[in-house]
């Protein structure tokens, strides 16, 4: 029952995400609709965590924010559906012609969901980083009240990590009324399903239904995917956001819809809000979008991208400057920058990479 309530607690944020996506990207064909649906979790959870963080940073109670959010999200999705009746229509699939592929997809999705559930039951607290970082911070936020910032007194294991995952779990616990392990399990199970769904919908929109089924079934069949999805870390979330940003970037080259740049900028900004490793992704995507703007000879592309990026990135900058302690990796003796100039490190990487590729070639 608590697991079901955890899923219900996540739904308003998914509704909020869909509302935002559809407001920016008004394509109404079935293939685009699937992409919107499976992007909704990332956008919705991201917006919620950003606003929730700013709310509690201002000294306001998280409980009040959580209830305002659910009311607003439900009202917005009701208004959206009432104004866009075509959204009620499901994407058309020739069931008779595609019955075999649909069965293959359904069976794969069923086994994937069962694997995720069994992993969650086996490791209800996640794996080590979840115990000592992500879920601990969420407990400080939920249980700490006005003293939630004492979480930054922790001086072990990246105390400067941003708050996408902790805020999302803390808001879920507000609805559950306790720090139940089912809250994080539901979040990461939902994210794992949405990653697979987004992968399917992107292949479907760029290729076709059969190739999408084949690709996603192979994807979810890897034990690595289940493991990463349910460890309760932020790595899989970061991969999901980068996948969404990359997929929409490719879509822009086909549709020429510059407004998608707003979503790309927002998604890649959320990547940095999810984990420090998302910061290099911002640099990479920013350079890519500058290149696209030059190629298409329009600065509207980069303008839309930067507008989408500004809210999550500015929030992250404020968090890093005024709240987060110094990064434990960057503050070690000697610093990180001098190590970047040690050519022996690059030689070791090249040697190991060559050895790995050589072995793969021999096995073929």
Regions found by a protein language model. Give the residues of each.
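Membrane-embedded, hydrophobic transmembrane alpha-helices
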Residues: 1-94
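Transmembrane-helix signature of polytopic, membrane-embedded enzymes
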Residues: 31-37, 179-182, 199-221
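Membrane-interface transmembrane helices that cradle and orient dolichyl/undecaprenyl
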Residues: 245-260
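Transmembrane-helix motifs of polytopic, lipid-linked glycan transferases
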Residues: 74-86, 183-206
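Short acidic/glycine- and proline-prone juxtamembrane loop motifs at membrane-interface regions
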Residues: 230-237
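Membrane-lumen/periplasm interface segments of specific transmembrane helices
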Residues: 113, 123, 284, 291-364
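Membrane-interface alpha helices of multi-pass inner-membrane proteins
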Residues: 215, 260-276, 282-287
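Extracytoplasmic catalytic/substrate-binding loops of multi-pass membrane glycan-assembly enzymes
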Residues: 123-137, 143-168, 178-179, 328-330
């Amino acid at each position: 029952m608590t697991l079901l309530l955890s899923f219900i607690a996540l739904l308003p944020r998914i509704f909020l995400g869909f509302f935002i996506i559809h407001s920016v990207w008004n394509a109404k064909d079935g293939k685009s609709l699937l992409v919107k649906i499976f992007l909704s979790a990332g956008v919705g959870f991201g917006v919620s965590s950003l606003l929730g963080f700013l709310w509690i940073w201002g000294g306001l109670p998280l409980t009040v924010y959580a209830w305002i959010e659910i009311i607003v999200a439900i009202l917005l999705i009701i208004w959206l559906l009432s104004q866009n009746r075509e959204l009620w229509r499901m994407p058309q699939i020739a069931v008779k012609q595609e019955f075999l592929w649909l069965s293959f997809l359904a069976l794969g999705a069923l086994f994937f969901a069962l694997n995720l559930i069994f992993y969650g039951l086996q490791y209800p607290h996640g794996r080590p980083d979840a115990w000592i970082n992500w879920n601990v911070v969420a407990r400080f936020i939920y249980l700490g009240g006005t003293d939630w910032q004492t979480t930054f007194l922790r001086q072990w294991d990246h105390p400067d990590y941003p708050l996408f995952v902790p805020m999302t779990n803390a808001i879920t616990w507000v609805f559950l009324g306790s720090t139940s392990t089912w809250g994080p399990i539901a979040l990461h199970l939902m994210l794992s399903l949405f990653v697979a769904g987004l992968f399917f919908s992107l292949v479907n929109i760029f290729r076709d239904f059969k190739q999408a089924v084949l690709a996603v079934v192979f994807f979810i069949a890897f034990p690595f995917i289940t493991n990463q999805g349910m460890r309760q870390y932020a790595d899989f979330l970061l991969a999901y956001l980068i996948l969404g940003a990359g997929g929409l970037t490719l879509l822009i080259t086909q549709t020429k819809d510059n407004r998608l740049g707003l979503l790309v900028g927002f998604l890649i900004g959320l990547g940095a809000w999810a984990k420090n490793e998302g910061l290099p992704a911002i640099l990479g995507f920013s350079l890519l979008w500058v290149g696209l703007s030059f190629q298409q000879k329009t600065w509207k592309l980069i303008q839309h991208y930067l507008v989408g990026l500004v809210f999550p990135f500015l929030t992250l900058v404020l968090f890093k400057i005024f709240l987060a302690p110094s990064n434990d990796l960057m503050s070690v003796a000697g610093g990180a920058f001098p190590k970047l100039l040690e050519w022996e490190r690059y030689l070791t990487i090249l040697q190991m990479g060559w050895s790995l590729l050589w072995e793969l070639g021999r096995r073929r």
